[in-house]
From Swiss-Prot:
The keyword Membrane applies. Keywords: ATP-binding, Cell membrane, Cytoplasm, Membrane, Nucleotide-binding, Protein transport, Translocase, Translocation, Transport. Part of the Sec protein translocase complex. Interacts with the SecYEG preprotein conducting channel. Has a central role in coupling the hydrolysis of ATP to the transfer of proteins into and across the cell membrane, serving as an ATP-driven molecular motor driving the stepwise translocation of polypeptide chains across the membrane. It is an enzyme of class 7 (translocase). This is Protein translocase subunit SecA 2. Its EC number is 7.4.2.8.
Length: 781
């Protein structure tokens, strides 16, 4: 233990010492638990719940609850939690992130904290990266939970809403981040409370927490409806962009920006038969041209997206997975569809949106697990208030992480990778090769095929075969090429379960991991390395890098340029240099910082709309929960009358005509506003008299239609009006974000401008909701 402790942060070391005291208590209960029957172990659940009712806390019953789970895990799964797994479980219960190396049995770690927190009856959500893992983990762990009297459910895509609702009612619910997030949005669009599927967001345990809370945090969840625009403009813009030359546009790959030059603008004006492309009336055309440029010059097929069944599918740059149901926004997806000659689907209109940051912050308690979180600890703390605790490994890591081999050109690098694969393959040692894109994995695959080397390819195009391919990657002679191993969730066991073969693979040195390029994030590189050397197994990792790789080319700076000039140009000569290694790491840190800024910016924008979202969703929930909204309706009426009085009656000359005309046109029935001696009354007296008349008019309506019918009408009208205006508002806020981004608000803080303009728009939204609701209710018969 002391050897491992020495490599942990001092703070973590202190934390682990404290946690070991709790684990000692759990260990002390092990013998007494062995003597209990299945029925007696199950009865402990009712005993724990009763103790909680009487005022004990989850922390009070933790040692016993963990000891119960450990015993049931042994009996049902044939697996006993190690001390380090119990430590990880306590960290998770405490609402922190447990950083545990690959192969340390993270799935078994979560069982005890899941059970403990499910005792509250408020539900626990176990969140993972795809449906396969959600269903697998649910099936794997259900025997433990069910034998303790807990119900277990799973949320998967395209599930019937009634089944979905039942799954959420379970004590423990497995599912993916996007399914939980989209259900939250959909629940806040339902016309009736019975259509909601989720209950309160109590406790979430996020597996591969860095992948979900960091990598995916740049892409907000969006529910969209079809827009009503002309799709021909995408085809025209696409035809034009095919004619442009390099001098017609300026491209910055580092910042991913592109714009027409003066010659490009002139060419566009000639192509479209207009005199001034930058005139305000041509803003829509300019936008379409710009998106077509981005689609052609910045977005690459088999890198950023793939074509599957005639559709453009986005590839997650961090995991290499196809992102089902996601579309690029602001017309970029349609521009790519035009470029690839597939069906162009209508520009979607945003109806509901939330970032992962703001969704996960809705949980009463949040925690997670991953093999790599320390590099992003600052982000976890500042955005999610989550501390990261490094959990020691059960056995020391003995994997050899070799120095990078660096080449001048990409071609030299790939030739060397193929040579290394051939050399290692002759020994029969299994090899895992990590690539950064579908395109690169297929390039390497072709090179190996030319040499007659049998291998497997795992990328966004083979998503359905993922688990099967990975499960065999540790066998003798196996060569597996994988796009970004991040979040794969399946352990690579040496020998794939065959004990004799496992020993043979160990004797050969375990799994050999080759990285063909440094990723933008050091964390993703560490995840690839961590596929090897699990549970004290031997293993080796090495990265092959070229000075033409994106991270080095875009972010390497002057150090790399100098190194390029100094090194010899001999073919296939690897450059080995401490300065170069440091430069690569500096480049990666630079990109990580930049990506953090992007995610912070996404959150800054969403924080503005998040406050508005809370107000609107609370309003909807009041209606759905059958709360009396009579007072709210009357307040709306009062506000409309007050605003009218302040607009038309305050000043040197009172505009009685304007005042009454406005109220008649807004909601009051004709000839009802008869106020004797109006010119002798104060402004407030006129407003109060008007309000009293409006109340009498509404009371008369209730008598005619019946109180119950009017109450039902109020709810129906308010829901419809809120939804209609909120959807328009969200879409307008999305457009405002794009507009502010384009204008860049010279000398102004774009986030401040967005917040200020967003506030004004929200005030206008509330005014529109008030007037439309009151108008419908007063004028409906």
């Amino acid at each position: 233990m002391s050897v491992i402790d020495s490599i942990l942060d001092k703070a973590d070391e202190q934390e682990i010492k404290k946690l070991n005291v709790i684990v000692d208590k759990i260990d002390a209960l092990e013998d007494s638990m062995k003597n209990l029957s299945y029925e007696e172990l199950k009865d402990m659940t009712a005993i724990f719940k009763n103790r909680l009712k009487k005022g004990e806390t989850l922390d009070d019953i933790l040692p016993e609850a963990f000891a119960v789970v450990r015993e049931v895990s042994k009996r049902k799964l044939g697996m006993r939690q190690y001390r380090v797994q119990l430590i990880g479980g306590i960290v998770i219960h405490q609402g922190k992130i447990a950083e545990m190396k690959t192969g340390e049995g993270k799935t078994l770690v979560e069982v005890a904290p899941v059970y403990l927190n499910a005792l509250t009856g408020k539900g626990v959500h176990v969140i993972t990266v795809n449906d396969y893992l959600a269903e697998r983990d649910k099936e794997l762990m259900s025997p433990v939970y069910e034998s303790l009297g807990m119900t277990v459910g799973v949320i998967i895509s395209n599930q019937d809403p009634n089944i979905r609702k039942q799954q959420y009612k379970c004590d423990i619910t497995y599912g993916t981040n996007s399914e939980f997030g989209f259900d939250y949005l959909r629940d806040n669009m339902v016309p009736d409370l019975s259509h909601k599927v989720q209950r309160e967001l109590n406790f979430a345990i996020v597996d591969e927490v860095d992948s979900i809370l960091i990598d995916e945090a740049r892409t907000p969840l969006i529910i969209a409806g079809d827009g009503d625009e002309d799709l021909k403009l995408y085809e025209l813009a696409n035809s034009f962009v095919k004619t442009v030359k390099e001098e017609d546009f300026e491209l910055d790959r580092k910042d991913k920006t592109i714009a027409l030059t003066a010659s490009g603008i002139s060419k566009a004006e000639s192509f479209f038969g207009i005199t001034n492309l930058t005139d305000i009336k041509n803003i829509e055309l300019y936008h379409h041209i710009n998106q077509a440029l981005r689609g052609h010059k910045l977005m690459e097929k088999d890198v950023d997206y793939v074509i599957s069944n005639g559709e453009v599918m986005i590839v997650d740059e961090f995991t290499g997975r196809v992102m089902d149901g996601r579309r690029y926004t602001d017309g970029l997806h349609q521009a790519i569809e035009a470029k690839e000659g597939v069906e162009i689907k209508n520009e979607s209109k945003t109806m509901a949106t939330v970032t992962y940051q703001n969704f996960f912050r809705l949980y009463e308690k949040l925690s997670g697990m991953t093999g790599t979180a320390k590099t992003e600890e600052g982000e976890f703390e500042s955005i999610y208030k989550l501390n990261v605790v490094q959990i020691p490994t059960n056995r020391p890591v003995i994997r050899a992480d070799l120095h990078d081999k660096v080449f001048k050109t990409e071609e030299e690098k790939y030739s060397a990778v193929v040579e290394e694969i051939i050399r290692i393959h002759k020994t029969r040692q299994p090899i895992l090769v990590g690539t950064v894109s579908v395109e690169k994995s297929e390039k390497l695959s072709k090179m190996l095929k030319k040499q007659g080397i049998k291998h497997q390819v795992l990328n966004a195009k083979q998503h359905d075969k993922e688990a099967e391919i990975i499960s065999k990657a540790g066998k003798l002679d196996a060569i597996t090429i994988a796009t970004n191993m991040a979040g794969r969730g399946t352990d690579i066991s040496l020998g794939a379960g065959d004990k004799e073969e496992e020993q043979e693979v160990k004797d050969l040195g375990g799994l050999y991991v080759i990285g063909t390029e440094r990723h933008e994030s050091r964390r993703i590189d560490n995840q690839l390395r961590g596929r090897s050397g699990r549970q004290g197994d031997p293993g080796t990792s090495r990265f092959f890098v070229s000075l033409e790789d994106d991270v080095i080319k875009l972010y390497g700076g002057k150090t790399i340029e100098k190194l390029m000039k100094r090194t010899s140009s001999n073919e296939n000569t690897a450059i080995e240099s401490k300065a170069l290694t440091r430069a690569i790491e500096r480049a990666q840190k630079g990109v990580e910082g930049k990506n953090f800024e992007i995610r912070k910016n996404v959150l800054k924008y969403d924080d503005t709309i998040n406050e508005q979202r809370k107000v609107i969703y609370n309003e909807r929930n009041k209606v759905l929960n059958d709360e009396d909204i009579q007072e709210d309706i009357q307040k709306m009426v009062k506000d409309i009358i007050q605003e009218a009085g302040e607009t038309y009656l305050i000043g040197r000359k009172r505009d009685y005509y304007g005042y009454f005309k406005h109220l008649y046109s807004t909601f009051m029935p004709a000839d009802t506003l008869l106020i004797p001696g109006v010119d002798k009354k104060s402004v407030q007296e006129i407003i109060d008299s008007t309000y009293e008349i409006s109340k009498r008019v509404y009371d008369l309506k209730k008598m005619m239609l019946g109180i119950d019918k009017v109450a039902e009408l109020e709810k129906t009208v308010l829901l419809k009006v809120v939804d209609q205006y909120w959807i328009d508002h969200i879409d307008a806020m999305e457009q405002l974000k794009q507009y502010i981004g384009l204008k860049s608000y010279a000398q102004k803080d774009p986030f401040k401008e967005y917040a200020l303009e967003g506030y004004d728009m929200f005030e206008a939204l509330n005014k529109n909701i008030r007037e439309a609701t009151v108008q419908y209710l007063y004028k409906f018969n």
